[in-house]
Amino acid sequence: MTMATHDKDVTRALQGLEDGSSSVRLRAALTIGTAPDPRCVDKLVERCAIEPDFSVREMLTWALTRHAPDLTLPGLLGEVRSERAQARSQALHTLSKIGDRRAWPAITRELLSDADDEVARSAWRAAVVLVPEEERTELADVLATQLGRGGRETRLSLSRALIALGEVILPTLGAATAKGAPAARQHAIATERLLHDPDAAFEFAIEEAKRVVALGTPGQEGQ
């Protein structure tokens, strides 16, 4: 392929990212990811913030992961501070896929407790990928402040994030079980159950946790 031909393909793909058809936008993102070009990075990041189609957003993220982190991190780190929730969420999601720990300082307590559930869930996933080993316990403590939050998907996302940290979460879950609000206690108990039994269904773990909380502290129900 000549340089002129490549330049034309890049121009066509960048234009395709703004097409009214989601299938055209999807193909454009695929094309860019297949033949990465630094000139496309800014547009990919920009589109992540506003792209309405989930499949296209996933392809945009994939295309960004195909470029060198030195090129993608600056734009993505700027987006996590955006006022637009989708920009924050998709940037965090992409950072979790890139997995470059230079992004860790950008995962702030504010993002981990973001009022938007999608942003918070993306922040949790990114955090457990990027956190340095020596900060895992501190991260578990921050994540535990969100126990009991939201509906099923949000709670399951938080449980998975906590479980990904491993057994360092046990003291944190124990504290939440002993002193938390009922919803947080239920969530903490269910999360510990899933840590020890990954094959258990989340709904079953929650229902079991509700019974434990209703009866009192864990272990009392058999007394």
Could you say what each language-model-derived stretch is?
Residues M1-H6, R12-Q15, S22-D37, E46-R47, ...:
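Structural detector for internal amphipathic alpha-helices that build alpha-solenoid repeat scaffolds
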Residues G174-Q223:
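Eukaryotic acidic, Ser/Thr-rich intrinsically disordered low-complexity regions
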Residues T137-H187:
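Ankyrin-repeat and related helical/solenoid repeat scaffolds used for protein-protein interactions
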Residues R12-G16, K43-E51, G75-E83, A106-D114, ...:
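Alpha-solenoid HEAT/Armadillo-like helical repeat scaffolds in large eukaryotic proteins
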